[in-house]
């Protein structure tokens, strides 16, 4: 029997964890998992210090000795009431910037991919709400004129209210790699290697 501590947000728990649990039930029913959610830098620090067996997420900066492996590529989409569309396929940049936004971020000082893409063009969005819950955010849009820009896979098993629609962002936001990270000096440990392979296998089924 083995207990693994994994770092991930509710995005990872929603997108990757179901397939991982199905594999674990079939291959290693004695294995258990504990999920920890922290900001990116804190998660990476806990991996580096051995407090977490591995972590899933987006990690632009990694401590020395921490290794990463790509699970899949992800992209952003927008979600809002269909009545906000000012063109047939979604939002113009002017409408997007005039709207108020929901921002999902685990960081104490949010500065994530969407805001970075805007800042590179000298633009800013109006953020009405910042919260750390990917799976909750889409449901908060109903009955409001708020716009959410979110990683696409989070929407695959969510049932959106009829008034909401998904469209492409009106500006180029780079795709990003969703990865798993682990402590390099534990790389040859059999249990950890097994865990990482199971996570890779689960990601291939998404």
Task: Please annotate each region the language model reported.
Residues 3-7, 55, 79, 102, ...:
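Short, well-ordered beta-strand segments
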Residues 39-44, 48-52, 57-58, 107-165:
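Hydrophobic hinge/microswitch elements
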Residues 26-30, 138, 143, 151-165, ...:
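C-terminal effector-binding regulatory domain of bacterial HTH transcription factors
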Residues 11, 38, 108, 185-186:
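Short, surface-exposed acidic/glycine-rich loop or hinge patches that mediate macromolecular interfaces
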Residues 67-81, 93-98, 169-177:
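Short Pro/Gly-enriched coil loops immediately N-terminal to beta-strands
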Residues 1-63, 131:
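Central regulatory/effector-binding core of bacterial HTH transcription factors
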Residues 58, 85-93, 99-121, 152, ...:
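Secondary-structure junction motif
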Residues 62-75, 145, 158-168:
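Ligand-binding "clamshell"
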């Amino acid at each position: 029997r083995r207990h693994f501590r994994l770092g991930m947000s509710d995005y990872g728990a929603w997108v990757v964890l179901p397939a991982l649990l199905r594999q674990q039930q079939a291959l290693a029913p004695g294995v258990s998992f504990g999920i920890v959610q922290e900001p990116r830098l804190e998660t990476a620090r806990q991996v580096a210090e051995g407090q977490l067996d591995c972590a899933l997420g987006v990690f632009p900066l990694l401590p020395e000795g921490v290794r990463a492996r790509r699970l899949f590529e992800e992209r952003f989409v927008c979600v809002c009431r269909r009545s906000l569309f000012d063109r047939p396929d979604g939002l113009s940049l002017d409408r997007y910037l005039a709207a108020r936004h929901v921002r999902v971020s685990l960081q104490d000082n949010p500065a994530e991919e969407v805001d970075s893409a805007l800042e590179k063009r000298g633009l800013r969005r109006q953020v009405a709400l910042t919260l750390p819950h990917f799976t909750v955010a889409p449901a908060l849009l109903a009955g409001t004129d708020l716009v959410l820009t979110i990683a696409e896979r989070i929407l695959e098993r969510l049932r959106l209210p009829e008034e909401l629609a998904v469209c492409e962002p009106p500006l180029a936001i780079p795709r990003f790699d969703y990865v798993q990270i682990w402590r390099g000096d534990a790389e040859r440990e059999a249990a950890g290697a097994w865990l990482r392979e199971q996570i890779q296998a689960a990601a291939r089924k998404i």
